[in-house]
Amino acid sequence: MRYWGKLLGLALGIVSSTGIWGMIMGLLMGHWIDRARASRRRDYFSAQSTRQSLFFLTTFQAMGHLTKSKGRVTEADINIATKMMDRLELFGDARAAAQRAFREGKAGQFPLRIKLRKLRDACLGRFDLIKMFLEIQLQVAFVDGVLHPNERRVLYVIADELGVTREQFEFFLRNMESPTGQQSRQNQSRQNGKSQQRRNNGYSNGHSYGGQRPPSPLRGPTVESACRTLGVRSSDDAVTIKRAYRKLMSEHHPDKLVAKKLSPRMMEMAKRKAQDIQAAYELLKSANQTK
């Protein structure tokens, strides 16, 4: 209730038996209380908006820095950046801002560590956002099927600045570097590469690309990709796989993320992630790897 401070102040003024002056003082005190509460509300929503804007901005800055670190930005890099913008529903001015951020990240002296520290401070207590950010960068790094030494170095910097332990990050890398995973990413990169030439302008000269994206071929998940999604090994037992599934669903289920006041764009990403987790678990069950 927006005016409870004034009502409370008025009530206290009445019961104080000081007459009209008591009621006036009570109203004034209540007004100050209401203003303080309104200010805190505005600060909270401003912080939420700032955090989400910073998340998107840093995502594409780091993405540009990561892809440029290997010498040049490839068509596969442009492809994955475009797909990320689509997944985040960044269109119009938001898309142009993301493309500018991508170009900023490609600059030779881009202050990556400083930007990452700002993001970590803004996401304090929100490891779900940190993990989402890291997953995006990993997908970008492995999109062409080969992890360049410079990309690996940048990924270590990202993990370090975001507070991800070396052990956790090495496990993520092992899953991404599996032979089956590399082959599937190479195949997808070859299939999508030809369709991306006309998209490059938005990332190189500041203009948005035109034309419609051709439909991507449907690719079913494999046991290997399902294991990567759940963060397990094919040799893990049913209990371990089920525990990993439940943990991931607890982190990414949209119903639980509603209380965290994520933006609609992030909620959509969480929904898709939950669907991927569910599909991976069902695939492993159907493959008789779980009971």
From Swiss-Prot:
Bilayer disposition of the protein: Single-pass type III membrane protein
Superkingdom of origin: Bacteria
An example Gene Ontology CC term for this record: plasma membrane
MF GO annotations: protein-folding chaperone binding
Region (Disordered) location: 177-223
Keywords assigned by UniProt, alphabetized: Cell inner membrane, Cell membrane, Chaperone, Membrane, Transmembrane, Transmembrane helix
All ranges on the Cytoplasmic side of the membrane: 32-291
SMART domains in the cross-refs: DnaJ (SM00271)
Topological domains annotated Periplasmic: 1-6
Spans through the membrane: 7-31
Membrane recorded as keyword: yes
Residues of the J domain: 225-291
One Pfam family this sequence matches: TerB
InterPro entries with a match to the protein in the record: DjlA, DjlA_DnaK_co-chaperone, DjlA_N, DnaJ_domain, J_dom_sf, TerB-like
Subcellular location: Cell inner membrane
Compositionally biased region (Low complexity): 181-211
Entry keyword annotation includes Cell wall biogenesis/degradation: no
Domains: entry comment: The transmembrane domain is a dimerization domain.
Free-text function comment from the UniProt entry: Regulatory DnaK co-chaperone. Direct interaction between DnaK and DjlA is needed for the induction of the wcaABCDE operon, involved in the synthesis of a colanic acid polysaccharide capsule, possibly through activation of the RcsB/RcsC phosphotransfer signaling pathway. The colanic acid capsule may help the bacterium survive conditions outside the host.
NCBIfam families for the chain: PRK09430.1 (NF006948)
Quaternary assembly: Homodimer.
Protein name: Co-chaperone protein DjlA
Biological classification of the source: Bacteria, Pseudomonadati, Pseudomonadota, Gammaproteobacteria, Enterobacterales
This protein's encoding gene: djlA
